[in-house]
Amino acid sequence: GSGKTTSMINNFNNQDKYWVIVPLLSEVDRVVEGSKEVQFVQPDEYDTKVGTKYASLAEHIAKGRNVVSTHHLYEDLVPLAKAGHLKNYHIIIDEVPNVVKAESTKSKLSIDTFYIDTGFMIVDEDSGLVRPTQRWIDDQSEVSDTLSSKILKSAMTDCLHLQDNKAFLRVLPQSLLEAGLSVTVMTYKAEGSMLLAYLRKLGLKFEIERDDDLEEKFRLQAAGLITVEDISAISSSI
């Protein structure tokens, strides 16, 4: 409702490549349909033999197409970022992505016994970063009845950390924040967000740009939706 998506669409040009990440599928359609001069595609699980949206997205990027997808696929693109496939893209994220969220909780005994001592997982002592061993990757189908496939998937994207030896936390990967020619996060209010605190913790340089005209327009629209009325029972008692 603030007009930032419309402003973004109006500023696309055919000289640059874009990967746009939006919160909802309806907004994916909006970017594809609204960008008349610059053609965008969206991932489709029926596009490839593999039959996943990730494979479709990876194929579009490999071919240098402008792509729009949801936040759901964002963290899955770590392998592409590390391989340098995003280096020619301007990455635009509509709304602040999740910086950290709980993935799973297990007892220290379970983690030590089934994951670490058996050689399926390595945990960095300083950062808590969780990495699967090649053994887990190779044997994942054989051990999926005991070891969490969800934990494996997150660990393979370098975004999983172990907190207090029991809580698995999914953290926004630094490699995605450093990928591409630029990374832009569009949000109504950046200050006070967890993302800024995270960027400062990582030591990454960033710049905050404000669109005063757009913000004032949003304030006026919001004010027009608010009606203030007296409650007679309260007013009469004052």
What are these regions (language model features)?
Residues 37-76:
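Inter-Walker segment of RecA-like/P-loop motor cores
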Residues 21-24, 68-71, 93-95, 185-188, ...:
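Short His-Asn-centered micro-motif
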Residues 181-183, 188-238:
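Conserved helicase/translocase motor-coupling segment
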Residues 73-206:
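Signature of the SF2 helicase/ATPase Hel1-core->accessory helical subdomain module
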Residues 27-31, 50, 192-194:
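Short, charged/polar "capping" segments at the starts of alpha-helices
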Residues 3-4:
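Conserved glycine(s) of the Walker
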Residues 17-19, 34-45, 65-66, 81-83, ...:
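Active-site regions of enzymes building and remodeling cell-envelope glycoconjugates
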Residues 7-45, 72-73:
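Conserved Walker A/P-loop ATP-binding site and its immediately adjacent core
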